[in-house]
Amino acid sequence: MKIVLASNNPGKLAELQALLAPLGLELLSQAELGIPEAEEPFRTFVENALAKARHASRLSGLSALADDAGLCVDAFGGLPGVDTAFYATRFGYAKGDNNNVRALLEQMAHLTQPGQRRAALVSTLVAVRSADDPEPLIASGRVAGEIALQPVGSNGFGFDPVMFIPEFAQTFAQLPVSVKNANSHRGKATAQMIALLRERWL
């Protein structure tokens, strides 16, 4: 079964291809099909993921899977949230993972006490059989941790180098990819999605 991933992010595509491999699904990126990115006008992950999935399905004629994910920092009232990908641009930097990390560390520099750097990575996955599917599959994963004082590790992407996970006493970027994938927000959401796909679509 072919499913289009409503994302142009190569890191996200590689991670989801690995996580969905047990189902034998062929996951194509929307970029391969010449599909432009969808608008993301909403303030919640689930609404944006649904909009992206419907957009990719409408333009490809295929079933679609979309992920909307982000970092929610307690000290910032849950922000940057749905604006995570563009976080650095709020502070004069170009869009990009390294600049997002730099901007976050600068904005959190004054927060040095235990508990002040709490944050969560959240992922919401939505799958639709068609653009007008009235019953989308929805899965959500969340991992709580703390923002490290500086980036550590070279695996992963996004905020992985500064997302310190107390249960492992390491950042996501320090963990082997297989361990990170099994325990990440996207890994948890994907496990739920796999169960839903098996139950309802396959």
UniProtKB/Swiss-Prot annotation:
GO MF, one annotated term: dITP diphosphatase activity
A biological-process GO annotation: purine nucleoside triphosphate catabolic process
This protein's name: dITP/XTP pyrophosphatase
Residues annotated for Mg(2+) binding in this entry: 39, 68
Subunit composition and interactions: Homodimer.
Entry similarity comment: Belongs to the HAM1 NTPase family.
UniProt keywords, alphabetically: Hydrolase, Magnesium, Metal-binding, Nucleotide metabolism, Nucleotide-binding
